[in-house]
């Protein structure tokens, strides 16, 4: 599987063996009112457990985890 990953820049990379899901996790930090939600993209073996105030989406096809604002 290939997933978009966040870091210094957003890139699409092949996932490590055993990590066959892509995920997008969003949450608010102190700048949420001016910058919007923090977005984290990457690969995972299982969909992460949602914590309070987080939103997580998982999917299993190549590059299925983009956020609409990142593709503009």
Curated annotation (Swiss-Prot):
<feature type="disulfide bond">
    <location>
        <begin position="47"/>
        <end position="58"/>
    </location>
</feature>
<dbReference type="InterPro" id="IPR018354">
    <property type="entry name" value="Snake_toxin_con_site"/>
</dbReference>
<protein>
    <recommendedName>
        <fullName>Long neurotoxin OH-5</fullName>
    </recommendedName>
</protein>
<dbReference type="GO" id="GO:0005576">
    <property type="term" value="C:extracellular region"/>
</dbReference>
<feature type="disulfide bond">
    <location>
        <begin position="28"/>
        <end position="32"/>
    </location>
</feature>
<dbReference type="GO" id="GO:0099106">
    <property type="term" value="F:ion channel regulator activity"/>
</dbReference>
<feature type="disulfide bond">
    <location>
        <begin position="15"/>
        <end position="43"/>
    </location>
</feature>
<dbReference type="GO" id="GO:0090729">
    <property type="term" value="F:toxin activity"/>
</dbReference>
<dbReference type="InterPro" id="IPR054131">
    <property type="entry name" value="Toxin_cobra-type"/>
</dbReference>
<keyword id="KW-0629">Postsynaptic neurotoxin</keyword>
<dbReference type="GO" id="GO:0030550">
    <property type="term" value="F:acetylcholine receptor inhibitor activity"/>
</dbReference>
<dbReference type="InterPro" id="IPR045860">
    <property type="entry name" value="Snake_toxin-like_sf"/>
</dbReference>
<comment type="function">
    <text>Binds with high affinity to muscular (alpha-1/CHRNA1) and neuronal (alpha-7/CHRNA7) nicotinic acetylcholine receptor (nAChR) and inhibits acetylcholine from binding to the receptor, thereby impairing neuromuscular and neuronal transmission.</text>
</comment>
<dbReference type="Pfam" id="PF21947">
    <property type="entry name" value="Toxin_cobra-type"/>
</dbReference>
<keyword id="KW-0800">Toxin</keyword>
<keyword id="KW-0964">Secreted</keyword>
<keyword id="KW-0528">Neurotoxin</keyword>
<keyword id="KW-0872">Ion channel impairing toxin</keyword>
<comment type="similarity">
    <text>Belongs to the three-finger toxin family. Long-chain subfamily. Type II alpha-neurotoxin sub-subfamily.</text>
</comment>
<keyword id="KW-1015">Disulfide bond</keyword>
<feature type="disulfide bond">
    <location>
        <begin position="59"/>
        <end position="64"/>
    </location>
</feature>
<dbReference type="InterPro" id="IPR003571">
    <property type="entry name" value="Snake_3FTx"/>
</dbReference>
<keyword id="KW-0008">Acetylcholine receptor inhibiting toxin</keyword>
<feature type="disulfide bond">
    <location>
        <begin position="3"/>
        <end position="22"/>
    </location>
</feature>
């Amino acid at each position: 599987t290939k997933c978009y990953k966040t870091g210094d820049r957003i890139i699409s990379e092949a996932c490590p063996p055993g990590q066959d899901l892509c995920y997008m996790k969003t949450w608010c930090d102190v700048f949420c009112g001016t910058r919007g939600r923090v977005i984290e993209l990457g690969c995972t073996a299982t969909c992460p457990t949602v914590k309070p105030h987080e939103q997580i989406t998982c999917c299993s096809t190549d590059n299925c985890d983009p956020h609409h604002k990142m593709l503009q």
